[in-house]
Amino acid sequence: MFGFLKQVGDYTRDAVDAARNLTQGLAVTFDHMKRRPVTVQYPYEKLIPSERYRGRIHYEFDKCIACEVCVRVCPINLPVVDWVMNKETKKKELRNYSIDFGVCIFCGNCVEYCPTNCLSMTEEYELAAFDRHSLNFDNVALGRLPTSVTTDPAVQPLRELAYLPAGEVQPHGVDPSRPRAGQRPDQVLSSLKQNAGGSAGNEGESATSTNTSKGSAE
């Protein structure tokens, strides 16, 4: 008898523990359901990186002193610094500087330890290429100003067409009652047609009212 009661007690305790664990898991799931969707319609929608995002490295040739600190602090000794010694001034003269982004791990050590701040991280993250050799950027390519996501010509016209309405595109920290930050192309076309039809209807109504007012005046 006591053995049966013990089994019932153990079963009840296990059932309560299982229900508690299930409730905790569902609480986490329901918490995520309150958040906005994370998936975006790339490349028509692009997430704006944070200020500390580590993207493509920007390089300023005029500030570089060829000290090779970036090479020493790099975990894989990636930067290639080509310089010669000027016998007259007894100083280094920089000839070329290159970084292969196909190998770079974007740790940011070169930017952090550069004594002249000639290296900086940008928000540019679209570095895909068909040829891996094209990812080896020289000082000219590294000196190119980065393309900002907010001023991307492929996104800006769609932003004006209400594809990306004003507001944050970040999924968290936004009022859940607000509509999704972005519409699909068919929704954009339908909204544009509705706006065009509404404006045409308003013009027709204004023209009818004008004719009516003229007739009453006569």
UniProtKB/Swiss-Prot annotation:
Comment on bound cofactor: Binds 2 [4Fe-4S] clusters per subunit.
Cofactor dependency: [4Fe-4S] cluster
Subcellular location as annotated: Cellular thylakoid membrane
Segments passing through the bilayer: none
Residues of the 4Fe-4S ferredoxin-type domain: 55-84, 95-124
Pfam families: Fer4_7
A cellular-component GO term for this protein: plasma membrane-derived thylakoid membrane
EC code: 7.1.1.-
Keywords from the UniProt entry: 4Fe-4S, Iron, Iron-sulfur, Membrane, Metal-binding, NAD, NADP, Plastoquinone, Quinone, Repeat, Thylakoid, Translocase
Annotated GO MF terms: 4 iron, 4 sulfur cluster binding; iron ion binding; NADH dehydrogenase (ubiquinone) activity; quinone binding
InterPro entries assigned to the protein according to its UniProt record, in alphabetical order: 4Fe4S_Fe-S-bd (IPR017896), 4Fe4S_Fe_S_CS (IPR017900), NADH_quinone_OxRdtase_chainI (IPR010226), NDHI (IPR004497)
Record carries keyword Metal-binding: yes
Quaternary structure and interacting proteins, as annotated: NDH-1 is composed of at least 11 different subunits.
Chain's role: NDH-1 shuttles electrons from an unknown electron donor, via FMN and iron-sulfur (Fe-S) centers, to quinones in the respiratory and/or the photosynthetic chain. The immediate electron acceptor for the enzyme in this species is believed to be plastoquinone. Couples the redox reaction to proton translocation, and thus conserves the redox energy in a proton gradient.
Family: Belongs to the complex I 23 kDa subunit family.
Name the UniProt record assigns to this protein: NAD(P)H-quinone oxidoreductase subunit I
